[in-house]
């Protein structure tokens, strides 16, 4: 699949920009530094896809036709947390580490963002052999694949974006792991209970998730909630407390917060 890559100067704070994209249901974007060290926004449009409304007055400084494969090959393998590597181009051959391969499909989320990194950190810290894991808002499937490779017995990954579901399925096949990937509007299509629910989405969506999360968890379950801008942390904590969840551990990188929660 071919995409039009547009490069625009970053006019607003990163967290505000991410929120706007999520509100529009647009996920093919990246925030990077140009050769001068200035942050720029890259977005990727499919043929005939319109520019998100809030960007229509932004200056476009460059554009070109590209493919996801072109984008992926620019990335070198990297260690997302100690002992776990993201390998977009299959350059790593190690038996002493967990390696997550990424297919050059149609997704642009690769684990570079701190919210993904913190989620993987807590999965590695708290996941026990044989745990069951639910990944809500799975995107490319990195968290679900990591959970399975860390020893989870059953992993379910859901997303409301059909494109994300396709990409996650491709990455699951690429990594030869047993993960069920399916479409679901938050927990609408989820059945059963899980030992760990991990979700790397926006604070407002976490608030909605918390309304129903007790149905898919048990007394000893754990929540790992990431993608929370620090100024909205208290909002998530209040909603969690209303439903019987307390913060066990907190981690922050830049303005992004990840919370680990247990039942009170």
From Swiss-Prot:
Gene3D superfamilies hit by this protein: Vaccinia Virus protein VP39
Keywords of this entry: Cytoplasm, Methyltransferase, S-adenosyl-L-methionine, Transferase
PANTHER family: ELECTRON TRANSFER FLAVOPROTEIN BETA SUBUNIT LYSINE METHYLTRANSFERASE
Binding site for S-adenosyl-L-methionine: 116, 137, 159, 200
Tagged with keyword Transit peptide: no
Organism this protein belongs to: Thermotoga maritima (strain ATCC 43589 / DSM 3109 / JCM 10099 / NBRC 100826 / MSB8)
Protein name: Ribosomal protein L11 methyltransferase
GO CC list: cytoplasm
